[in-house]
Design a protein with these regions (language model features):
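Pocket-forming structural segment of enzyme catalytic cores
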Residues: 77-86, 338, 389-423
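Repeat-solenoid scaffold signature
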Residues: 374-390
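Acidic/polar loop patches that form or flank catalytic/metal-binding clefts of enzymes
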Residues: 274-277, 381, 400-407
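Flexible phosphate-sensing "switch/lid" loops adjacent to ATP/NTP-binding sites
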Residues: 1-351, 358-359, 365-372, 379
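Short gly/pro/ser/thr-enriched loop/turn and capping motifs at secondary-structure boundaries
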Residues: 50-52, 388-391
Length: 423
């Protein structure tokens, strides 16, 4: 492992009980709070998938593929990092087990291990630790989110890697935040901590005691629940914070800041903290809760409608744009495969947005919707395939009735969009 910068501090965010409890939002929020106190923060997401990148993952199952400024196809959590921290993340901010394993095998085939028996421990874990050390050099604090839940078979090597890394760089330079889910049973009208207890025990079995436990719940769980988590988690009560569901993810930094988590981390990591400047988050909160006099209705013509996370960054960008224009926003989803049968339904929208996609399914519907926007002088934003749809629609309206693109039909005569030589 390359020797990490000794002055840099590391915060590892793990989760227990189940996935999807908000590790990414929590990591981004903690980073935002520390940045508001004057620190230079970087973030990294580690996923235990054997995929090389997120570009081929099913968006209906996994959510959107977030593309970084240097072209890396990554997890949607990196979008949270960019929006919350106001930074540009790069391919160094995304680590998938498949890519690390591919590179490890390539090095073994090239003889770089000099005949050693290459194993998950120490070789794979060493490679993971190198990813931690090399990602975003120069930051004061590097936050690493470990995907999945502690105890998952596929994620064992990542948890072992953060344990080893903590010992190597010094425990005074590492902090651990563990998210647990606390379910509410309506029958008995109480929150149950047993799943959280088991999740904390799983983490301790790896030799890791969390510095902060974040208890996710539907509503405020109450001090008695926090005391129970504190006792079974082996951490002081002030190190247990309750994170109930929020109306908007942009409220989370303010919620976490009230828990003084930044002061807890500063004490553990010996961090210099300036006075927090949370004005931007308070301003966002005011925009979220404001009653707007005017509401803009936007129709999104898309085909991956099984999972709203498929177009997460598109939706968030629309919301942020609406706040800046001081208007409310109503988004309606329109099935690209059905819209062509009833274009009249589009009359009620103030504008259309057609995002990217792959394959020919639903393309004709997108082209029809784009053509309707052109002919009715409606504001239109086409992203990726959505822009192709607009160009094709314009060509067809202009008389090229069979207009298409090389991506959709590489043998067509009337291609109005071509592929670049390196595509």
């Amino acid at each position: 492992m390359n020797q990490p910068h000794v002055q840099r501090k590391y915060i590892f965010v793990t989760g227990g009980v189940l996935s999807g409890v908000g590790k990414g939002i929590t990591a981004a929020s903690v980073g935002a709070i520390l940045k508001a106190r004057g620190l230079n923060v970087s973030v990294q997401k580690c996923d235990p998938y054997l995929n090389v990148d997120a570009g081929t993952l099913n968006p209906a199952e996994h959510g959107e593929c977030f593309v970084t400024c240097d072209g890396a196809e990554t997890d949607l959590d990196l979008g949270h990092y960019e929006r919350f921290l106001d930074i540009e993340v790069t391919q160094q901010s995304a680590t998938l087990a498949g890519r690390v394993l591919r590179d490890l095998i390539a090095n073994e085939r090239a003889g770089k291990f000099l005949g050693e028996t290459v194993q998950m421990v120490p070789h794979f874990t060493n490679a993971i630790k190198t990813e931690f050390a090399n990602s975003s050099p120069g930051s004061d604090i590097h936050i690493v989110e470990i995907g999945g839940t502690v105890g998952d078979y596929e994620g064992l090597s990542f948890v072992e890697a953060i344990r080893e890394f903590s010992a190597e760089v010094g425990k005074e330079n590492c902090a651990f935040i563990h998210l647990v889910y606390v379910p509410y049973l309506s029958a008995s009208k109480e929150y149950k901590t047993k799943p959280a207890q088991n999740a904390m025990r799983d983490l301790r079995s790896f030799g890791i005691v969390p510095d902060v436990i974040a208890a996710r719940s539907d509503d405020l769980a109450g001090e008695s629940v926090m005391k129970k988590i504190s006792m079974f988690g082996g951490v002081p009560l002030e190190s247990v914070i309750n994170l109930p569901n929020a109306d908007s993810i942009y409220q989370v930094p303010l919620t976490i800041e009230k828990s003084h988590i930044d002061q807890l981390l500063a004490k553990k990591l010996n961090l210099p903290l300036g006075k927090p400047d949370m004005r931007v988050w308070k301003d966002i909160y005011n925009k979220i809760t404001k009653h707007y006099k005017q509401t803009v209705k936007i129709g999104i013509v898309a085909k991956y409608l099984d999972n709203e996370d498929t177009y997460y960054s598109v939706v968030e960008s629309l919301r942020i744009a609406a706040w800046h224009q001081d208007v409310g926003l109503e988004i309606n989803w329109i099935d690209a495969e059905k819209v062509g049968k009833n274009l009249k339904q589009l009359d009620k929208y103030d504008g259309l947005l057609i995002p990217g996609g792959f394959g020919t399914r639903g393309v004709e519907g997108k082209i029809a919707a784009a053509g309707w926007a052109l002919e009715n002088n409606k504001p239109y934003l086409g992203l990726c395939l959505g822009l192709q749809a607009a160009v094709i629609a314009a060509a067809r309206i202009g008389g090229v009735k069979n207009a298409t693109s090389a991506e959709l039909d590489d043998s067509a005569k009337d291609q109005v969009i071509y592929l670049m030589p390196d595509q």
